[in-house]
């Protein structure tokens, strides 16, 4: 008998990101909502609904967030059972210079030491997510949205990227890369770019919905300007018929996105409970 041997090529990104807990985001599939699942108004600086996703708002409008249960068609497209839904219940058609509306996830610093920020070996990160939106006052492609990575330790640095949709109310997958030298800068690879090894916040990931001129700036370059959105940021609060959905959020090392990491529910819940645990009086 003869035995034939075959050789299979395994792509480098698969090998590099095949470890457990590759996703730096906790509850990126929005399965855990210890505080509330029903529509709840944004409260500045607070967690109101989905675990690990904090609200930041200072506008004349009102945003609400809630858990959205995906249809079978949604699941077939995104591979996810839930999404984070934002609706506008009070409009603000003119965002003031010092006003803002965002959600963000703070990522614990001691879990980020492998990024090697503050050195010439700093790692590239890739963000992937599914999202959809409706913007009544604009075509889908003209409505630019912003997502920002912020390193707060020592000197705070910000890197904003833009994204837009092809059609209203249609799921689209986004893959966005954050290079440590984006914009030909050395802010992250110098010592001031380091992330302190402690239990504080090492990185923030922000999604913007309406920011005034004091909090907007150039995209695609690291800055220290304190900008949470680009100057092209669309104002989601302009119309009470507007909405925005997101699910499958993953931030990982490397310059390519890999498949979303589905963790067991009990594991993901325990990760959320490190920061907040709701106890029931019933036994």
Give the positions of each predicted feature:
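Extracellular and organelle-lumenal recognition/adhesion modules and their flexible linkers in secreted
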Residues: 6-283
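Short, Lys/Arg-enriched N-terminal segments with co-localized hydrophobic residues
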Residues: 1-4
């Amino acid at each position: 008998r003869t035995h034939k041997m075959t050789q299979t090529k395994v792509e480098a990104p698969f090998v590099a990101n095949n470890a457990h807990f590759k996703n730096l985001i906790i509850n990126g599939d929005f399965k855990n909502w210890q505080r509330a699942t029903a529509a709840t108004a944004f409260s500045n600086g607070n967690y109101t609904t989905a675990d690990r996703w904090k609200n930041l708002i200072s506008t004349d409008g009102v945003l609400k967030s809630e858990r959205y249960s995906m249809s079978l068609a949604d699941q077939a497209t995104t591979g996810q059972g839930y999404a984070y839904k934002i609706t506008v219940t009070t409009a603000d058609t003119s965002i003031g210079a010092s006003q803002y509306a965002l959600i963000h996830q703070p990522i614990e610093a001691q879990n980020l030491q492998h990024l090697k920020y503050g050195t010439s070996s700093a790692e590239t990160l890739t963000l992937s997510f599914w999202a959809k939106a409706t913007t009544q006052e604009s075509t889908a492609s003209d409505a630019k949205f912003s997502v920002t990575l912020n390193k707060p330790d020592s000197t705070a640095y910000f890197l904003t990227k833009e994204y837009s949709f092809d059609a209203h109310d249609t799921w689209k997958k986004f893959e966005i890369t954050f290079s440590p030298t984006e914009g030909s800068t050395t802010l992250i690879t110098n010592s001031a770019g380091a992330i302190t090894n402690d239990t504080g916040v090492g990185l923030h990931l922000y999604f913007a919905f309406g920011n005034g001129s004091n909090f907007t700036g150039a995209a695609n370059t690291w800055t220290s300007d304190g900008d949470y959105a680009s100057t092209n940021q669309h104002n989601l609060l302009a119309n009470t018929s507007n909405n925005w959905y997101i699910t499958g959020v993953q931030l990982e090392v490397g310059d390519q996105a890999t498949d979303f990491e589905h963790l067991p529910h009990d594991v993901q819940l325990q990760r959320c409970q490190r920061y907040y645990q709701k106890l029931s009086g019933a036994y």
